[in-house]
A protein has these predicted regions:
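Structural alpha/beta surface segment adjacent to cysteine/selenocysteine redox centers
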Residues: 80, 86-114
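Flexible coil segments in periplasmic/lumen-exposed cytochrome c-class electron-transfer proteins
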Residues: 152-170
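Non-catalytic, surface beta->alpha helical segment in thiol-disulfide oxidoreductase systems
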Residues: 109-154
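A short beta-strand-turn-helix
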Residues: 30-47, 77
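Bacterial Sec-dependent N-terminal signal peptides
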Residues: 1-23
Length: 170
């Protein structure tokens, strides 16, 4: 009888575990508009992560499917950044440091994002840190967001950080 009870408890544990894992793996990036991120940053400063994309860009769609859907990437972005999706081909108006401009002007003139996808990193006060053009798989992006999200860029070179960073997005 004791053996049967132990077997049932163990079975319930195995059955319950996947549910915990699957719910933990479903975190999605909380995307904001640029102006929403600016307003939030005034109350609680965090760096900005900006995904500059277009609707026709195949690699942008791959980043949505493979990189931004990764639960560790999404959780880290949600905790350490204000994440923004910016389509430069939309005529939406945004306010960069109080000046109204279109998405396209902001992406090209301020963020130097002229190819897609490009990820752009800003300080909480909208100071440009770095645009990074091209597709980034989950592990590549995970390394970069740790470098910026934990302010390693202020004290450590990218090469030194990259050599010692061993975490993965898997």
């Amino acid at each position: 009888m004791l053996f049967a009870l132990a077997a049932i408890v163990a079975a319930v544990g195995f059955i319950a575990k996947p549910a915990e894992i699957s719910s933990a793996n479903t975190e999605e990036v909380k995307w904001l508009t640029y102006d929403q991120a600016v307003a939030l940053s005034k109350k609680n400063p965090k760096p900005f992560f900006i995904d500059v994309y277009t609707d026709w860009c195949g690699w942008c769609k791959q980043m949505d499917k493979n990189t931004f859907s990764n639960h560790k990437v999404a959780a880290y972005l949600n905790k350490h950044f204000y994440s923004i999706k910016l389509n430069p081909e939309k005529a939406d108006s945004v306010h960069y440091k109080g000046v109204a401009m279109t998405n396209g002007a902001l992406a090209a003139k301020i963020f130097h994002a002229t190819s897609y996808p490009t990820t752009v990193y800003l300080e909480g006060d909208e100071t440009l840190l770095q645009p990074i053009p091209g597709y980034q798989d989950p592990n590549d992006l995970y390394r970069i967001i740790h470098y910026i999200g934990e302010n390693h860029y202020k004290t450590t070179t990218w090469d030194d950080f990259s050599r010692t960073f061993t975490e993965t997005a898997e």
